[in-house]
Amino acid sequence: MARLRIGVLYDYWWGEDEERAEGTRPKRKPPDEDVQAVYEALKESGHSPVFLRLDGTRESLVELAHSETDLIFNLVESFGGDDTQDSDVAGFLEMLHRRFTGTGSQGLHLAQDKALAKKIFAFHGIHTPYFATVFRGRTEHAQDIQFPVIVKPAAEDGSIGIHFGAVCTSIKELMERIDYIHAEFNSPALIEEYIEGRELYVGVLGNEKPEALPAVELDLSKLPQGMPKIAGTEVKWEEGTEAYEKTKAFLPADLDEDLQKKLSETAVQAFQALKLCDYGRIDFRLAADGALHVLEVNPNPYLHADAEFAMAAKKAGRSYPELVGEIVDLALARYPNGGS
């Protein structure tokens, strides 16, 4: 394999710092653990990685445009603290005709717009929970949803805006939650049928012939009594809390062959329906009656060596450096003379 200069692109914004003087650039800080892990894996694979940082300023975009790399490993999830702009960053790279890993601007936009993604799933015959989209003063695509429901921002990811209070069992709770979403996120609210069941994640690798990785389950059974079994903000981000500490991912051993096949086929179908590239993760709910529901598609899953995606890849026989190297190879193959 040719030794490549690969820019590991990540986002960082001034709001993560203490208050800064007007007109000054954000302070430097070490990259997050997943960014550092990808950097080290690329180095181990014989490449020459360099860090590229987007901090929400025009200057950082100019620096990115002038950076000299053979490929950009795109780990950006936001721009200037706005996580709805990851597709704009991909679009910027596309306009610069830069080669980069992962899904392009179109696929990122489709996955970000949860209501649009669900309509695409329905068109392709992929089962997803019933839903309605509520704008200020207007409801769109209202299906016959019954309580309990879960209410979330229509265009956020990473469980942002999804707390335990997002699960509503009455009209009063529902209206309060819709008002919260409108006020806090200036976003339409997505009301979705709440599916009680197991939380399963299926990673997908590939482009022309995508491969579904073994399913990983997030164990929500040990959440404190009275809390809904959802992977909300408390579970994903609030380190040190009981909810965070008691939810662990593992490789389930009790999924029968038919279910594994259905998970794999549906994951690949959803991956392709939203035009994902190279890698991605499909989030499912498995109901008690065996029904499988696609909750959402994550085109840029957390790539830390200990996270769910790498866990599934390891089960499929790939070391972490091999996984990172395969993502590089998949990206290069999408471009003319990709390996040169």
For every predicted segment, state its role:
Residues 1-101, 106, 111-112, 116, ...:
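ATP-binding N-terminal substructure of ATP-dependent carboxylate-amine bond-forming enzymes
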Residues 120-125, 254-340:
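ATP-dependent carboxylate activation and anion-phosphoryl transfer catalytic cores
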Residues 49, 99-100, 128, 149, ...:
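Hydrophobic beta-strand scaffold residues
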Residues 171-265, 288-293:
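Phosphate-binding site of ATP-dependent enzymes
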Residues 2-10, 64-68, 108-190, 195-198, ...:
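Active-site nucleotide/adenylate-binding loops and adjacent lid/helix of ATP-dependent enzymes
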Residues 15-19, 157-160, 240-243, 305-306:
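Short acidic/His/Gly/Ser-rich catalytic and metal-binding motifs that mark active-site loops
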Residues 22-28, 163-168, 310-312:
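Short glycine-enriched, charge-decorated loop/helix-capping segments at active-site entrances
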